[in-house]
Amino acid sequence: MSKKILKIKDLYKRFGDNEVLRGISLALNEGETKVIIGPSGTGKSTILNCINMLIPPDSGQIWLDGEEITDHVNVKEIRQEIGYVFQDFGLFNHLTALGNVRIGLIRVKKMSKEKANQLAYEELERVGLVDFADSYPAQLSGGQKQRVGIARALAMQPKLILFDEPTSALDPELIGEVLTVMKDLAQEGMTMLVVSHEMGFAKSVSDEIIFMEHGNIVEEGPPQQLFENPQVERTGEFLFKLTELYGEGENS
């Protein structure tokens, strides 16, 4: 039986009069990759922010590896277990690539500088950036910055990594290098929940695709089902429009 790393039950979140999440329930097994798709403003990123305790849900429950974390007092402890790759990279501009990757190891995990350096170099090598360890964010391309962000998340050795539209801030020619790293991670068995409009990645890499609209999950299932035989008409309409707009991406 697969080990359940993430479970969400009846998650609700409102911002003023706008109910962004309307009873979201989903689960993610160890080693699975699920991709959340849907129109802008439908609550996709809010789910990730609730999981990582950046935004408290109004109601509902979240479990990480069997432990309920919804009202967890020690947020820092939870965030050690959950990697987060941001849309806008989220790097510290005054730190080198190496410094950005090791900072959490030293400050949060209280690792020695020597051990943190070793692990940070290993993760930079994993994403193909060991030669840029001493470069600052201003000296890196968008794709390189995002790969540093992925290396930083990996260095914490999390149980789960959340990706919030990791390619949306990139020039088209740089998207492929980030998706290649993510594809490799999926093949290595990393547990990932990804918000993305990259249909090629979703189709070829994800175990399941979750289509959201108006704060609800409209349909969830294997890529083949959603692309070739959607059970809900709206799913087919959205995927047709999205594929027409963006194409099937780098990894189709």
Enumerate the predicted regions with their spans.
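ABC-family P-loop ATPase nucleotide-binding domain
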Residues: M1-Y12, Y246-S252
